Every structure is written in structure tokens, then in C-alpha cells.
Amino acid sequence: MADRRRQRASQDTEDEESGASGSDSGSPARGGGSCSGSVGGGGSGSLPSQRGGRGGGLHLRRVESGGAKSAEESECESEDGMEGDAVLSDYESAEDSEGEEDYSEEENSKVELKSEANDAADSSAKEKGEEKPESKGTVTGERQSGDGQESTEPVENKVGKKGPKHLDDDEDRKNPAYIPRKGLFFEHDLRGQTQEEEVRPKGRQRKLWKDEGRWEHDKFREDEQAPKSRQELIALYGYDIRSAHNPDDIKPRRIRKPRFGSSPQRDPNWIGDRSSKSHRHQGPGGNLPPRTFINRNTAGTGRMSASRNYSRSGGFKDGRTSFRPVEVAGQHGGRSAETLKHEASYRSRRLEQTPVRDPSPEPDAPLLGSPEKEEVASETPAAVPDITPPAPDRPIEKKSYSRARRTRTKVGDAVKAAEEVPPPSEGLASTATVPETTPAAKTGNWEAPVDSTTGGLEQDVAQLNIAEQSWSPSQPSFLQPRELRGVPNHIHMGAGPPPQFNRMEEMGVQSGRAKRYSSQRQRPVPEPPAPPVHISIMEGHYYDPLQFQGPIYTHGDSPAPLPPQGMIVQPEMHLPHPGLHPHQSPGPLPNPGLYPPPVSMSPGQPPPQQLLAPTYFSAPGVMNFGNPNYPYAPGALPPPPPPHLYPNTQAPPQVYGGVTYYNPAQQQVQPKPSPPRRTPQPVSIKPPPPEVVSRGSS
């Protein structure tokens, strides 16, 4: 298009100039304007027409150059595109014209040769152009040179311009395929680049750093490739690093304590350490260092168990310690109380029922004072020695951290444990279990029923679970009465929770060593009598805690602590035992009958375990979770209420002495559903509003 426009414009000029410059007529117009400082159209010796050329200077020059468009034309920078600004095509620009100039210059020689060779053709073409000025102006030349300069120029010019026609497509500025090779933007465009290398002279490269010794530190040295001798290794590292198989040769390492204590079972190296540590809770008394958690394990020596039992079951029994001290007090007496307290508080904290339990120690003190407790304590101590659970360490571990975990994870298990191992006081349970004559004591301790050895720890955990879960929620209700709270708390809190665990554990532990919860679960079966104990605990509910301050303290409070005790229930059953037997007659027990003499279970009887579950679970309507058990002999304790207790998932609240008791164990049976997970929603990517889109597109 541009070419044609140019052609037409030049043709007009040609017509006017045809007379003036015979053969050059077309040339000046087109060439004249386009020549930027060189011969305009380049006709040989054509006189430039002032009109055709934009600058007379150009034409004069051309005239001077006058003649063949050879040299001059080559100089002429084919700017005929620049003839008139209006004529410029869309693709053409000053830059283009400059490019054309370059091209014409480059091809000067070609142009000269062609012009000379094509003189005849030029003349004929010019004639044609003159003849058909209105035609496309030398059609022959028009399309022969692809640079657009052919249109109105005489063939000579066109011949001169034919050079550009031979340009490659990528070199022809007017060709869409033109690849610019100059200019800032295109300096990195390497398409079809042939002379870019020459164009960009490479500056000499300077070394900014020296590479001479660069890899000295890492050089491959043949002499270093052989294995080092032992002497070299020792000189280098201080010991023979290759003698891993020979421990003696290995550099001794400082033994570090595990940062996050792992269970002694897992970390045999620290078992000794751990056990002592665990006993550190036991309190000032060093006698029972293991006892602190041992009982819970039902591990450790019987004595430890016993003392622990006291602390556990009677830990709250600060006063009790005095009684205990009779038997146990001597060894554990002071320690028991203190330790129990520590332990109790420690455990309570653990159990989440801390607040309730902690208070209990004080209230318990009076309760502890009761002779029953004393009896239990004395019995328990003896029993404890019998039950010498050998795994104090393990209990410790479990108590400290497994229990919490378990309580959380095994709510169901805890309930089961409660059924199986109601006794709250593990230590007592274990002690009671061992001594056959200490059924009463056991009862008092509640822990006695539990087999010290069996699964004290496991039971402990299970009980804890139950106690913690069912207990803590309902505990407040049971514990509401200060006394109740105090007593049961005591039991639960001070040592109650621990005792519970102990009891459960001990029930399990009956075998004499700490067993896993599963084992204790199985073990409990042998102890059907336990249910009575459990009942007693439940009955404890019955008794007014106030009424049975001493012996019943637990039972009276039982309601509150019951949940945990519920697990301990069997021991609870025993609970009454010491005082209960004595107190059994006392009216304080709402159901003395229920509370048969502690149903003194045989000391070894783990009945509490069974009893436990049934007992506290059985609390169907009555608070006696172990109601059926009252009359049963320790061994004869009916296994019973358990089923019914499960059925009564929600035992109706019982009101005794103006206190409403709920069976936490039963309440706890239903695990609290976890809140529904929030459905993860992917981040929604929304398209921009249409307005934005339209704006962008527009």
C-alpha cells in the first residue's frame, strides 16, 4: 500500500517533471524526495526538479553527482519512502528509511553494476514510465524491487534498488519477517544471527580471582587413598573410629539422661534412676522410695506396696497415717502421710480431680483417724510386704505419664477397669490382696482388693481413667459435701486417685507383679468377691460421709469420689471393712446391710476388681454401685450388679444425708463425642468480576 501510494505520488511528479528530465522524469520525484543528501532518484545526470526533491540541495547534489546513478545512487539512501510524511506506510518510519539507506549503502556496488548493465532496460522502462505515467509507474520495476522504491522510479533507479530486493526476508525492513538486529530491544534477538558475533566485540576478560590454590584442600592425592592405620586414626580422632565392634576400643561417651523420660521398660539404662526418682514423690520417708508408684505397679516389695497403699488409698489419710503407722506408720507412717499427700496431690493433679482430691486429705485426716483405718493400715502394711510387687519402676512410669494418657485414650477401658477393679487404692488393694487376713484392712484401704501384682499399674490407669473421666465430671456432685468431698477426695485425691489406680493395678497385680491392663482384666475374674467390696464403696455412698467419718470417710464421700472409687468400689466395699465392720452396725451407713461387714474379702481376693465394676456400675437406682454385694462374703461377693450397672448407664442420682450422689462411672460409660471435624474447604479461587475482566480486555 505504501509503495503504491508512493508510486502514485511519484508518478504525479514524474508527469510534471517528464519534460525537464527526460529519462529521469520519475526518478527525481521519487528519488529526489527520498534522497537524503545523496542523489535523489538517481537517474543518470537527471536534473533534480525542485518540486520533486524535498531539498534542492539534494537534487543539486544529485546533479553534481550527475550522471549515472552509479556512485551517487549508491549514496542515495533510498529514502523515497520519506518523500512525503503522508505517504509513509504503516510499516515505514524514519527508522525504516534509515535502514533502507543502510541497505542501499551496503549494496552500492550491486546497484552500480546493475545500473550499468541495465542502462538499456532503464531507458526503456523510463520510456514506459513516461508513456504510462498513470499506470503503476513502471510496473516492471515496481514489483521487482521489494523495498518499495521501485514504484515510480525509472528502471535505472529500480535496478539500483533491485539490490534491496535480494535482501532476505528477515533483512527486509518492509517484510513482516524482518528481524531487527539493531536497537536496544533487539540486541539479544539471535534469530538468524550471522554477524552478531563480529558485531559484539568481546572485551578482554579479566580474571577476578586466582584459581591456583583453589582446590588444594580437596585435592585428590594418591597417597591419601589408602586406609589409615590404627595409629593414624588414633592420632587423628583420639580413638579407633573403626572398632565399633569392639566396645572397649570405642571412645567412651558421656551417658546422658534421656531428655524426655521414657519408660523404664523402654530405657533399661535408667531404670534404677527412674525408680529412685519415682519414689522421690513418696515423700520424705525413704523407706518406701519405690512404694510411691510401686504400689500402683503393685511392683516393689510388699512393704513398699503397703506403704504405698496407705499413701494411695490412705494417702489422704494423713490422720490415718497415724493409725497405719501402727503397722505401717513405723516405716511409712510419717512418710506415708507426707508421701501420700505429695503423691495424692501429685496424682490428683494428674487426674484432673486435683482440686477435689487435694482438699480431701484434710478431711481425710479425721477419717483416717478412725480405728478402722488404723486397722486397715496395720493390716495393709503386713499385707503389703506379702505383696511385694517387684516393678516399682514401671508403676512409676505409668503413673506419671501413662496413666494420664490412658485415661484419655481408654475411657472405655477405664470403665471396664472400674468394673473389674473398682478398688481405688491400689496400694491397699495390693496389700489386701496379699494378706489373706487383711480383708478388712483391705477394705479399709480399698486398695487391698486390687492385686498388687496383677496389673496395678494398668488397673491404676484404668481406674484413673474412670475416676478421672466419670469422676471428675461428677465428682463435684459427690464431693459437694465437704466431708464427702474431703473423705473421698482424700481417698481419691490424696491417695484416692492413686489408690484407685493401685487398686486397679493391684487387682491386676494380684499375681504379684505389675501386669498390663489386659492381664489385670483377666485376673479380676478370680476375684468375684470383689464386688462386695465395690459395693461397700458404693455403700460408702450410702453412708453419710459425715456419719462414717472415720471408716466410712471414703464411703461416705464415696459418692463424690465414688466414680474413681467406683472403680475402686471393691476396695470401697472393703473400706467399710476396717471401720465398717466395726462401723458396719452403725446407722451411719444408709445401708449397713448393704454394707455387709466389709464383706471382708479374703485378702488375696481381688473380688474388688469384679466387684468394682459391678458395684459401682450396678448403682442402678440406688447409689450402691455394688448393692448386691453387701451380704456376700468376700469370696462370695456376687459378681452381679455389673451387668445391670452397665444397663444403668445413667444411674439415677441418689440422695443420702441431703447429698445427691451420681454414679460417675455409669455416667462416664458414654464417652463424650468429639466435636465434628470442620470440613476442610479448599480456598476458592473466584474469577475477577466481569467489570475487571472487561476493563482488562478493553
Curated annotation (Swiss-Prot):
High levels in heart, brain, including hippocampus and cerebellum, liver, kidney and testis; lower levels in muscle, lung and spleen. Residues 585-609, 636-645, 672-691 have a biased composition (Pro residues). A motif (Nuclear export signal) lies at residues 457-466. One of its GO terms (biological process) is intracellular mRNA localization. The lineage of its organism: Eukaryota, Metazoa, Chordata, Craniata, Vertebrata. Keywords: ADP-ribosylation, Cell projection, Coiled coil, Cytoplasm, mRNA processing, mRNA splicing, mRNA transport, Nonsense-mediated mRNA decay, Nucleus, Phosphoprotein, RNA-binding, Spliceosome, Stress response, Translation regulation, Transport, Ubl conjugation. Required for pre-mRNA splicing as component of the spliceosome. Core component of the splicing-dependent multiprotein exon junction complex (EJC) deposited at splice junctions on mRNAs. The EJC is a dynamic structure consisting of core proteins and several peripheral nuclear and cytoplasmic associated factors that join the complex only transiently either during EJC assembly or during subsequent mRNA metabolism. Residues 19-28 have a biased composition (Low complexity). This is Protein CASC3. The gene is Casc3.
